[in-house]
């Protein structure tokens, strides 16, 4: 089994990205099989606990207060409401509950509510994860002490291209948050976005940043830009699908023991594209972020694709994604009142 590395160079990664596609996907699948069951995919859902009105100016994001995208702004959900959602999921057999807030960073006044959410979710016996923006060292410790398992904070793009995307926080701010999360003892979820007009070198540089962290992120979301009217990136040209697949494959090769997640943009990928990404080493999806607010035919598409590909939800010690998936299926069939699910990656 190849040794896990933290010393990749941009030149090495560029060379991987430019390999013949068949060779690249073969290498990625070979690496993948050394660390994971190739026919299992991790499934996760996310609940938005606070939506819209974010003060950051990320040019891709419909939640930014800088742009007029028609997104409804919502205040922080009450702790009782969040725990009611968690309890309902628990009663139906859910194993994991993830919460996301559109903040630059949580304020001191927010922390007691967030901590109570974590404690309540953990008291139910559920695995917990959050994405709240930047964290100080002290805030990270508070979340860890409350029992948080995972924290998501993306690097978005390369250090060189970053200034063309965001001006309200620095690249180092993002790295500092990841360091604070890791130092506090939580697991890290960190990835990026492709299709924002970046070069191949920028994609290589992003992957190098992630792979050369002192410890690889446990989860690496690879997002395809979702172009939203009202944002500065609404009119960008589409990224070639094969370039996205190459990014997934190289992420798998560089971070062989991490979950590589198909995240934002997956709803716009056809079945063949998703299957090729799974072949290239993707083994995690946000499964259900839109399922409870869309019509049944769209909701059932994921279930049908898994069946056609012979893919099963991942089995993990202490958690059963088969049960987690069954919760989502049950909710679809019952046609419950809409519950907002939010791709906070």
Curated annotation (Swiss-Prot):
Free-text comment on the cofactor: Binds 1 [4Fe-4S] cluster. The cluster is coordinated with 3 cysteines and an exchangeable S-adenosyl-L-methionine. Binds 1 [2Fe-2S] cluster. The cluster is coordinated with 3 cysteines and 1 arginine.
SMART domains attached to this UniProt entry: BATS, Elp3
Pfam families to which the protein is assigned, alphabetical: BATS, Radical_SAM
Enzyme Commission no: 2.8.1.6
Keyword terms of this UniProt record: 2Fe-2S, 4Fe-4S, Biotin biosynthesis, Iron, Iron-sulfur, Metal-binding, S-adenosyl-L-methionine, Transferase
Pathway note: Cofactor biosynthesis; biotin biosynthesis; biotin from 7,8-diaminononanoate: step 2/2
Family: Belongs to the radical SAM superfamily. Biotin synthase family.
Assembly notes: Homodimer.
Protein name per UniProt: Biotin synthase
């Amino acid at each position: 089994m190849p040794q896990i590395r933290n010393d990749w160079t941009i030149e090495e990664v560029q060379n991987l990205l430019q390999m013949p596609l068949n060779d690249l996907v073969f290498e990625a699948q070979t690496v993948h099989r050394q660390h994971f069951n190739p026919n299992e995919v991790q499934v996760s859902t996310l609940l938005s606990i606070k939506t819209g009105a974010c003060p950051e100016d990320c040019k891709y994001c419909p939640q930014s207060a800088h742009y007029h995208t028609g997104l409804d702004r919502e205040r922080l959900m009450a702790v009782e409401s969040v725990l009611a959602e968690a309890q309902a999921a628990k009663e139906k057999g859910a194993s994991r509950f993830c919460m996301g807030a559109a903040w630059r960073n949580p304020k001191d006044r927010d922390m007691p509510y967030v901590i109570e959410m974590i404690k309540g979710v953990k008291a139910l016996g559920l695995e917990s994860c959050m994405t709240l923006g930047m964290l100080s060292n002290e805030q990270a410790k508070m979340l860890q002490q409350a029992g948080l398992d995972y924290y998501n904070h993306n690097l978005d793009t390369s250090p060189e291209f970053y200034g063309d995307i965001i001006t309200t926080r620095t690249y180092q701010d993002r790295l500092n948050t990841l360091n604070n999360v890791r130092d506090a003892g939580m697991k890290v979820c960190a990835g990026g976005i492709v299709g924002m007009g970046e070069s191949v070198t920028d994609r290589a540089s992003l992957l190098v940043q992630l792979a050369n962290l002192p410890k690889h992120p446990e989860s690496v979301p690879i997002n395809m830009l979702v172009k939203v009217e009202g944002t500065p990136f609404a009119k960008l040209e589409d990224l070639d699908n094969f370039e996205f697949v190459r990014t997934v494959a190289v992420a798998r090769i560089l971070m062989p023991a991490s979950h590589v997640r198909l995240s934002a943009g997956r709803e716009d990928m056809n079945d063949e594209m998703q299957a090729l990404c799974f072949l290239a080493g993707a083994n995690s999806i946000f499964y259900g972020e839109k399922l409870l607010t869309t019509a049944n035919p769209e909701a059932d598409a994921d279930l049908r694709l898994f069946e056609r590909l012979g893919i099963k939800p991942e089995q993990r010690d202490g958690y059963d994604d088969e049960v987690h998936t069954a919760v989502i299926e049950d909710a679809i069939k019952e046609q419950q009142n809409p519950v907002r699910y939010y791709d906070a990656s």
